[in-house]
């Protein structure tokens, strides 16, 4: 089953990019003390479908005690639904991520040379420019730690960068490959160049490259509550499931 393969891939990748994988009673702690500002690399992945919200909060407090945030990752959508309301009521941010696979041609054609693969230096510069513009007030240290995170994906998922336009990128995205699957991630367009079709060109270039190399499925994760999922549908992606993330910032601070 496609969704099961994607869940398996996500689990292996999550463990492949962190400093430490530590079993907990109701899941697995994914820890990267060397990059404490990168929430994505410091979380508790819940694996017990019977675990309740109070128990999981206590476990996250223990597992992530040295960090300024708390994060739960839940691949089981049914469990995510059950946890969403009680966790939201106690101040947790609830993020439902749609799993979308490319299963048809895009609705609109994009010029063949509008987007293409670029070298790591170009991709890194484009992502850094996008991240600095985000409304969360990321400090430069967080931008640097996110760049270090990208290097981990280079190793664990043979990550590559795609951009549009190629010479002076307005949009950059990343392509991960493992186990015959491909994931498009970190899609970002600088504010001054939005609405010009660069994101479509970059994403389609990455998706086409993955498909040409035999990857199946080609998929991405996107926030169910935000508009991009509608745009991804126009690029030929369809929803097949969802995963959940829960985030709490007890100490406040900038979003990495």
Report residues per predicted region.
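Conserved acetyl-CoA-binding loop-helix of GNAT-fold acetyltransferases
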Residues: 53-61, 186-191, 195-212, 234
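Conserved GNAT acetyl-CoA-binding A-motif
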Residues: 65-76, 210-223
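Conserved beta-hairpin
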Residues: 21-25, 82-93, 155-173
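Conserved active-site alpha-helix within GNAT-family acetyltransferase domains
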Residues: 79-93, 200, 224-242
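Conserved beta-strand in the GNAT
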Residues: 25-32, 95-99, 168-177, 181-188, ...
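Flexible, substrate/cofactor-facing loop regions flanked by secondary structure
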Residues: 112-182
């Amino acid at each position: 089953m496609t969704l099961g393969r994607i869940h398996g891939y996500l689990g292996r990748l999550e463990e492949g990019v962190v400093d430490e994988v530590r079993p907990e009673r109701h899941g697995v702690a994914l820890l990267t003390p060397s990059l404490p500002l990168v929430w994505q690399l410091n979380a508790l992945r819940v694996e017990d479908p019977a675990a309740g919200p109070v128990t999981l909060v206590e476990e996250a407090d223990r597992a992530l005690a040295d960090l300024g945030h708390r994060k739960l990752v839940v691949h089981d959508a049914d469990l995510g639904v059950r946890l969403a309301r009680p966790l939201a009521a106690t101040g947790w941010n609830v993020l439902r991520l749609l799993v979308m696979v490319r299963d048809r041609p895009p609705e609109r054609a994009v010029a063949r040379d509008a987007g293409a693969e670029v070298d790591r230096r170009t991709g890194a510069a484009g992502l850094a420019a996008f991240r600095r513009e985000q409304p969360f007030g990321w400090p430069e240290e967080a931008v640097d730690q996110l760049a270090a995170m990208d290097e981990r994906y280079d190793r664990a998922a043979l990550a590559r960068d795609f951009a549009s336009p190629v010479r002076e990128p307005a949009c950059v995205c990343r392509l991960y490959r493992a186990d015959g699957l491909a994931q498009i991630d970190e899609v970002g367009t600088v504010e001054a160049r939005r609405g010009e079709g660069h994101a479509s060109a970059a994403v389609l270039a990455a998706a086409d490259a993955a498909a040409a190399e035999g990857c199946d499925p080609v998929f991405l994760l996107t926030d169910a509550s935000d508009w991009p999922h509608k745009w991804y549908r126009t690029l030929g992606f369809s929803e097949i499931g969802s995963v959940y993330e829960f985030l709490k910032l007890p100490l406040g601070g900038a979003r990495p």
